[in-house]
Regions:
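Non-heme Fe(II)-dependent double-stranded beta-helix
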Residues: 1-111
Length: 111
């Protein structure tokens, strides 16, 4: 298990987030990017609505990311072994689009 250090856990508890965590190799990141580009080509209109949610249900690549031991071990260090993936979302902001995303909480807490 690659757990977080006590300093990382303290940082999370003090700040409410932890960054960076090295969870993808360059090859894995390339695979994820290729998968996003494939999804954009196959279902371009779906990414504007509900189709951008729960992408791990249609993509083996994103399902693999959801089950990554690097991610799960880090989460386990904070909340324990009972982990539930509540969803996955492709939130894509293309470089040619204006605007920004301000600091926000993605969703309410589950449970």
């Amino acid at each position: 298990m690659t757990s977080l250090t006590s300093d990382q856990i303290n940082d999370y508890n003090n700040n409410g987030y932890l960054a960076p965590i090295n969870v993808l190799t360059k090859n894995e990141a390339s695979e994820v990017r290729s998968e996003i580009e494939k999804i954009e080509k196959l279902w371009p209109n779906e990414l504007d609505g509900l189709g951008r949610n729960y992408v791990h249900m249609i993509s083996p690549v994103f399902d693999k990311v959801c089950h990554s031991t690097k991610i799960l071990d880090a989460v386990e260090s904070i909340i324990g072994k009972k982990i539930l993936v509540g969803g996955t979302t492709l939130f894509i902001k293309n470089k040619d689009k204006k605007g920004f995303v301000s600091v926000h909480q993605d969703d309410k807490y589950i449970g």
